[in-house]
UniProtKB/Swiss-Prot annotation:
PROSITE patterns, sorted: TRUD, UPF0024
Protein name as it appears in the record: tRNA pseudouridine synthase D
Family of this protein: Belongs to the pseudouridine synthase TruD family.
Binding of substrate, residues: 27, 129, 329
Active-site residues, as the UniProt record annotates them: 80
Record domain TRUD: where: 155-303
This protein's record includes keyword tRNA processing: yes
InterPro entries: PsdUridine_synth_cat_dom_sf (IPR020103), PsdUridine_synth_TruD (IPR001656), PsdUridine_synth_TruD_CS (IPR020119), PsdUridine_synth_TruD_insert (IPR011760), TruD_catalytic (IPR042214), TruD_insert_sf (IPR043165), TruD_pseudoU_synthase (IPR050170)
Keywords: Isomerase, tRNA processing
Amino acid sequence: MIEFDNLTYLHGKPQGTGLLKANPEDFVVVEDLGFEPDGEGEHILVRILKNGCNTRFVADALAKFLKIHAREVSFAGQKDKHAVTEQWLCARVPGKEMPDLSAFQLEGCQVLEYARHKRKLRLGALKGNAFTLVLREVSNRDDVEQRLIDICVKGVPNYFGAQRFGIGGSNLQGALRWAQTNTPVRDRNKRSFWLSAARSALFNQIVAERLKKADVNQVVDGDALQLAGRGSWFVATTEELAELQRRVNDKELMITAALPGSGEWGTQREALAFEQAAVAEETELQTLLVREKVEAARRAMLLYPQQLSWNWWDDVTVEIHFWLPAGSFATSVVRELINTTGDYAHIAE
């Protein structure tokens, strides 16, 4: 299995270094649900601003404040402890009376607004996230500037970030031990983390192998293509390659890579043979995913940061703004810009 640090770069390995997250204020995330609260219903959507505390900790504190069970407070996604993050929590509080959440106090956390909502906020139910990052002590401004320009045109690999695999790769190691021993895993969280790490690692490896090709975005017979921003896909045929290539070049269509699991992967012929060869040696992880009935899926191979802009404060400090769809990793963007340094170089989102 290819180590995350050794995955293929789209724009070549960065020439310089830089400090990511010298302090939490250098990594700002604003969650974009893609919808507004209904204004009525048995749930309450609470928009919070937090710094120095993780999402689960805040959710548990909110449940305690509302005198409800912790499982009655949900969220669309975990946000990093070591960052300034804005996100929504959802508490199930039936009844006409609206609690006064302005009285909710927690160090490092502030309630920005709250309103009634009809439905529970479920994991993954967000449109995306807006990021504002500050990179400090940049050693090669010219290289970073050119890479930012190139990313606007060509995007970045849509890798799952290193944090998906746990500190020191612990989630992936857990998946490998599980695959090798076949011992039942009772802890639901461990099961989820380990299976997710296994599938993500296989996806990253397929993308890394594809990026070694001279023309990364060249459509081949049997590729699974998806409309930009959509989840469904269709299979490319030889007769359509020229037209499909035009649409890929125009960013109307995205080439996808497999999230291996049980069932068909989605590609056919040449593309399927390539994907199978890319992970042929990872039989244990593939067997684990099939055994645990994790369905195969697809994910775009490349990621195009939206609304990308940047501002150099000086020759060694740059502030970068961009928006990413749900499930994408800001660290996969930063990875193409600089070789990161600092305690939190691999901890984000």
